[in-house]
A protein has these predicted regions:
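Intrinsically disordered, low-complexity segments enriched in serine, threonine, and glycine
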Residues: 332, 372, 377, 381, ...
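Extended, low-complexity, turn-rich repeat/linker tracts enriched in Gly/Pro/Ser/Thr and Asp/Glu
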Residues: 112-114, 633-638, 698-700, 711-721, ...
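Autoprocessing Asn-cyclization modules and mimics
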Residues: 293-377
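Extracellular ligand-binding interfaces
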Residues: 667, 673-777, 802, 810, ...
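Carbohydrate-binding surfaces of carbohydrate-active enzymes
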Residues: 276-291, 295-297, 311-316, 535, ...
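Carbohydrate-recognition beta-sandwich/jelly-roll modules
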Residues: 24-245, 267, 279, 283-287, ...
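Glycan-recognition surfaces
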Residues: 302-314, 391-406, 449-555
Length: 898
């Protein structure tokens, strides 16, 4: 091996000499750049392996007039290298220096005009893993990173190419990039050395680099901590094994922007906030501040009664005519185009904000005067009109203005005075409204961090290659209200955590919602929380729980679940679980029976009518029947007068198949806007009364199940290849609930859809982002404000010839029901749940001991003794359900491996 390595390095040196190449060595890597500007080689000197791809790429390039000009020649001129870029008329001088651990490429001078971008360095690399945030490609053996040495360097990955660019709008001359090419186990050590050598941000917590600190491994509770509830919240946090409590921005302050202390929650003002943090510190807990980077609330003093001039505008024009204080139409001298987040537009004229519902060219129509607490007043022709940039219903600070610094001073000042230990920069991605996101996303984050005088655990959304340095870890996105387990595996771990892993940034698996029962989602249950806890242990990742004190108190199983989470957290931090066991826990579902002992477990839910029979599959050995059985609402039959008609096709409505260019899954085939009158529908749908009465948003809170009558024609398909139609409810805030119909039948059929199919959304039908965001179908949903029914294809076999027509869609009325003396039987035994259970109540039994009966929020109603229950044999089992009176239940069979 040593002989082969020596020959490889010698051959590289010979080739370099022949081609008049320039060779740059660190202790572990050798970069060779040809005199024609091509990056010819990057070798791992420890084993002689080439790290560049076979196709040759110039080591640098410029963009001018939209065209890329690769470096075409490089020559040494004293201590510098002079680089020419083809026929661009541009050249540049570089200083390239090598140290034991890294190379530094510095742009010392640019000759020529019209430069739009200079790629200080670019390498087409072979390692498989791509960290596009940090500009690093890596595998288990070797890592290659182009790390900018200032905020003005844009490191990124495009396909296989790692590059670092500078732009004239920020700064070019004097900018530097470090090439870190090292064995992967040494990568973070070298990064820390680069941070020290070039005085880059390199925060520590308790003297340890923040990313490797104990704090970065600990979990936190994200909740509404106040003066009044501090003791209770601390108790819950300690119960769950949390080391931090993160306070919502809306809890500690009243509005975004100037962030006044919320006197309702902290009657003693800033002193009260400090006293709560001091109390947490005394209890061994640290406290984090949640804020929303650069957003300014419409109720904030920076907006009302007089808007700050530093609010960001995304378009400006001038008033074409005089207007008085009552006119609701403005005529501008020129049109502004459409705002990024659509109509309506908020515009500021002098010191008045007008909320204009429509625009027509240069006209602003249906304007509400004196909006957001400003005063309506007359304005003269020629007055400047500025359209206020909006994101998520709030305004933004112009990060080029003094307002940005004022906000940063406010936040850092509060941190320093009251003793926060953590900051969560939420909404950072919205700062792309100011300009290129790679730069502007991190600007205010850095201002705040730089002015804070405390060790801070930094997290947030919207990370850049530069703010990577101050972030201690990442967060794996918001919580899902439904399909919690699938959301964790298919999104949080597969997408978000993979992103952070690829970029060498630790991650925690939050946020997980800790919820109480509402019409759109059930209360959080112990098996959902244990699913998170198991993955937390498997991946050695912290978790954050997002909730509020009301939900913690409402969920009757909070104590049980938090104690379980705390036990898992202690086990994880102890390092007692062997790596081989943790690797097993990363897949499937598991249950801890005692500390450190885990068994595979399945929770298989299905609806069942009482009286009736269902089949249960036990994939493990023989065992006692374990179950959760919940009373569901009784559904009216299709055609019942209490049902709500959503769609009636006269004649049946053809659901057109996807076109050749349509992107799947989730392409929209038809849409019914329920809030519009029949005559305003842009389709052949007949919705509601045939007289064309005005439509309205529907309250389906008690009509959440759907019935659809379909006519399906075409060749039969295998069930795995069958077409799947999505009857999607849309709420007024563009959130959704997906109801899937597998078109495995032919002919006419009425299909009942008792609940959404959220568990299939990510596992089978992740929608194309151009159709709709999957998050909008799994987050909270307002059944009380349903505005549309969308028909979407989630799967459609190409050239299948399938035709589908819809004749009727109804939302079925729900009626409360009650069950008494529920019996579950197999051939060998019967178990009885004595007493009554009403809609939403559920009974849970784990094969021995007592049966516990809970309300929908997990509040224990009673505990009843259980007789010897049925046994499940390995394989298929028939279970019979009986009770006093008919009803529908959801039975969850719980099976475990011994």
């Amino acid at each position: 091996m040593r002989l082969i390595l020596t020959l490889a390095l010698a051959l590289a040196a010979v080739n370099a000499a022949r081609a008049e190449n320039f060779v740059f060595d660190t202790s572990v890597a050798r970069l060779v750049i040809g005199s024609d500007g091509t990056a010819n080689s990057l070798i791992n000197k420890q084993n002689g392996k080439e790290q560049l791809r076979p196709e040759k790429l110039s080591f640098s390039a410029v963009r001018k007039s939209g065209q890329i000009f690769p470096a075409s020649a490089i020559e040494k001129q004293g201590a510098l290298f002079h680089v020419t870029f083809g026929t661009s008329g541009v050249s540049a001088d570089y200083r390239i220096t090598a140290s034991a651990d890294y190379l530094v490429v510095e742009l010392t001078q640019v000759q020529g005009n019209g430069v739009e971008e200079i790629r200080l360095m670019q390498l087409s690399t072979s390692p498989a893993n791509a960290g596009g945030l940090l500009g690093v490609r890596w595998n288990e053996e070797f890592s290659i990173c182009l790390m900018g040495l200032s905020q003005e360097v844009d490191s990124r990955i495009t396909s296989t190419v790692v590059s670092a660019s500078v732009y004239p709008e920020f700064s070019m001359q004097g900018q530097r990039v470090a090439l870190i090419a090292v064995p992967t186990p040494e990568f973070l050590d070298v990064v820390q050395k680069v941070e020290r050598d070039f005085q880059l941000p390199s925060p520590t917590i308790g003297g340890t680099w923040a990313k490797l600190s104990t704090d970065a491994r600990t979990s936190y509770l994200f909740t509404d901590l106040t003066e009044a509830n501090a003791d209770e919240t601390i108790r819950y946090a300690k119960m769950g094994g949390f080391r931090y409590i993160l306070i919502y921005s809306g809890t500690w302050s009243t509005s975004l922007g100037s962030y006044p202390i919320n006197l309702k929650n902290f009657p003693h003002g800033e002193a009260g906030l400090k006293s709560v943090i001091d109390k947490c510190h005394a209890a061994g807990l640290k406290v984090g501040m949640h804020m929303v980077t650069s957003l300014v609330g419409k109720n904030d003093p920076l907006v009302t009664p007089k808007p700050d001039p530093g609010l960001l505008k995304d378009g400006e024009t001038t008033l074409g005519t005089d207007v008085n204080e009552k006119q609701t139409e403005l005529r501008a001298t020129s049109a502004l185009g459409s705002p990024v987040q659509g109509n309506p537009s908020d515009v500021v004229v002098d010191s008045e904000i007008l909320h204009c519902s429509r625009t027509d060219g240069a006209k602003f129509l249906q304007c509400q005067r004196g909006f957001a607490g400003t005063s309506a007043r007359a304005h003269n022709a020629g007055a400047r009109i500025g359209r206020l940039a909006e994101r998520d219903g709030e305004y933004l600070a112009n990060l080029r203005s003094p307002l940005a610094s004022a906000i940063s001073n406010r936040i850092s000042g509060v941190i320093n005075r009251v003793g926060f230990d953590m900051i969560y920069f939420d909404g950072g991605e919205t700062n792309g409204a100011d300009g290129p996101a790679w730069y502007w996303t991190g600007v205010q984050q850095f201002q705040i961090w730089g002015r804070s005088k405390r060790d801070l655990l930094v997290q947030g959304s919207g990370v850049t290659d530069w703010s990577w340095h101050i972030f201690a870890r990442g967060t794996c996105d918001d919580y899902s209200a439904v399909a919690v387990k699938q959301h964790l595996d298919y999104h949080k771990i597969a997408d978000s955590r993979r992103f952070y892993d690829d970029n060498f940034l630790p991650a925690e698996l939050g946020w997980m919602g800790f919820l109480q029962d509402t019409p759109d989602h059930p209360a959080t249950t112990p098996d959902e929380l244990e699913y998170y806890a198991v993955r937390m242990l498997a991946l050695d990742s912290a978790v954050s729980l997002e909730t509020n004190l009301s939900a913690l108190k409402a969920n009757g199983r909070s104590g049980e679940m938090l104690e379980l989470l705390g036990e898992y957290e202690q086990l994880r931090l102890s390092g007692a679980v062997p790596k081989a066991m943790r690797e097993e826990l990363a897949q499937g579902e598991w249950h801890m029976t005692r500390r450190g002992e885990f068994h595979p477990i399945r929770y298989d839910a299905q609806r069942a009518a009482i009286p009736g029979e269902i089949m249960l599959k036990n994939e493990f050995e023989d065992q006692p029947l374990k179950f959760r059985v919940q009373v569901m609402p009784e559904l009216a039959n299709p055609g019942d007068p209490a049902d709500i008609l959503l769609l009636k096709g006269q004649p049946p409505v053809e659901v057109l198949p996807p076109g050749n260019k349509d992107v799947m899954p989730g392409i929209l085939a038809q849409r019914v806007e329920l809030s519009k009158a029949v005559g305003e529908q842009g389709s052949a749908f007949m919705v509601g009364a045939s007289d064309g009465a005005a439509g309205k948003a529907l309250d389906l809170t008690k009509h959440r199940a759907l019935a659809v009558r379909l006519e399906v024609e075409g060749p039969e398909q295998a069930s795995t290849d069958s077409a799947v139609l999505n009857l999607q409810l849309e709420a007024g805030n563009k959130t959704y609930r997906d109801y899937y119909v597998d078109l495995t039948f032919r002919g006419t059929k009425t299909v009942l859809l008792p609940e959404p199919g959220a568990s299939r959304t990510l596992a089978e039908f992740r929608p194309a982002p151009s159709n709709y965001q999957f998050k909008a179908a799994t987050y909270s949903f307002n059944y009380g404000n349903v505005v549309a029914l969308n028909l979407r294809w989630m799967r459609y076999p190409a050239s299948s010839g399938l035709r589908c027509r819809v004749t009727l869609v109804e939302a079925l009325a729900e009626r409360d029901s009650a069950l008494k003396q529920v019996q579950l039987s197999t051939g060998n035994a019967t178990i009885t749940i004595p007493g009554e259970m009403t809609t939403g109540n559920y009974a849970e039994y784990w094969g021995d001991g007592s049966i516990r009966v809970f309300d929908p929020n997990g509040v224990l109603l009673r505990t009843v003794p259980a007789n010897q229950g049925p046994q499940l044999k390995a394989g298929e089992n028939k279970l019979m359900l009986r009770a006093a009176g008919p009803a529908t239940v959801k039975l969850t069979a719980i099976t475990t491996e011994k």
